[in-house]
């Protein structure tokens, strides 16, 4: 009898523990604090305040959006702007790269401009996109470059992209040396520390706490971004919503493939405008 009582008590304790875990997990997934100011949690997503979730997409006219994003008829959208990067010389060494086997080299970048935000469906003119503020993905580097040419720009070179993310101080993350948290970068959404069950990126520019000192957003996470390598090939930089570990989000993170993918987007770079 005593064994039955102990066994029954153990089962009850396990059920209670499981219920607590499920409650906490559900609360974290719907906790408004996980979404930046101007957005609120709707299931696995962060939608503009006043919106609801329909078919996995944020729907309705938002009453409020994060700083830098404007309310539109179908959601919050980043207002395109360019950021001037003054350029300079960046020396990379094994210490800068945490002894990851990267050879010491020096990068010199001249002044250029770069989009503050990833290119969105609204800016791209996508037809039938469920949310205009989401970044464009599943586009080849050539198609992305063609769009940038129409805008008077091009894809950034790998060195330009790196310099925009690290600055001359070789920042580990675009905002600084530490502090990779969910409020600064959109990562690990599918599976990982910021997991909500989402299956795609968040709104471009929705994490203002993760911007670089120059004011460039989403250089870590959300979508990886095309940049041109010295041999004219293209590779995706910076990690994405699928990235699960810090090493995939650091400023020097580069993916090996050259194919279009649902976690790869882009932004454009430009020659500097006259002062």
Where are the model-predicted features located?
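Disulfide-braced loops of extracellular cysteine-rich modules
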Residues: 33-36, 44-47, 62-66
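Functional-site microenvironments in short loops/helix caps that host divalent-cation chemistry
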Residues: 85, 91, 130, 137-262
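A short glycine-rich, aromatic-capped structural motif
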Residues: 74-142, 221
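Hydrophobic membrane-insertion alpha-helices, especially the h-region
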Residues: 10-21
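Extracellular, cysteine-rich, disulfide-stabilized repeat modules with beta-strand cores
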Residues: 39-42, 51-54, 69-71
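Short, hydrophobic alpha-helical membrane anchors of single-pass surface/secreted proteins
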Residues: 4-10
């Amino acid at each position: 009898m005593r064994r039955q009582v102990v066994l029954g008590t153990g089962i009850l304790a396990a059920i209670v523990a499981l219920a607590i875990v499920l409650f906490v997990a559900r609360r974290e997934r719907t906790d408004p604090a996980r979404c930046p100011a101007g957005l609120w949690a709707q299931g696995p997503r962060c939608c503009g305040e006043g919106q609801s979730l329909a078919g996995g997409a944020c729907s309705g006219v938002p009453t409020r959006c994060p700083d830098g994003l404007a309310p539109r008829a179908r959601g919050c959208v980043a207002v395109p702007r360019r950021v001037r990067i003054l350029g300079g010389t960046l020396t990379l060494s094994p210490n800068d790269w945490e002894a990851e086997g990267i050879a010491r080299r020096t990068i010199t970048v001249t002044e250029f401009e770069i989009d503050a935000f990833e290119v969105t469906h609204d800016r791209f003119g996508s037809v039938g996109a469920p949310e205009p503020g989401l970044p464009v993905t599943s586009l080849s580097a050539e198609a992305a470059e063609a769009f940038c040419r129409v805008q008077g720009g091009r894809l950034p070179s790998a060195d330009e992209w790196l310099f925009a993310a690290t600055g001359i101080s070789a920042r580990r993350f675009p905002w600084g040396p530490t502090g990779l948290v969910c409020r600064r970068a959109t990562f690990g959404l599918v599976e990982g520390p910021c997991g909500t069950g989402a299956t795609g990126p968040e709104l471009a520019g929705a994490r203002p706490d993760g911007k670089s000192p120059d004011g460039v957003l989403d250089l870590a996470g959300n979508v990886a971004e095309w940049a041109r390598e010295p041999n004219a090939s293209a590779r995706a930089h910076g990690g994405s919503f699928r990235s699960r570990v810090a090493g995939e989000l650091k400023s020097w993170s580069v993916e090996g493939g050259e194919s279009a993918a649902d976690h790869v987007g882009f932004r454009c770079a430009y020659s500097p405008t006259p002062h």
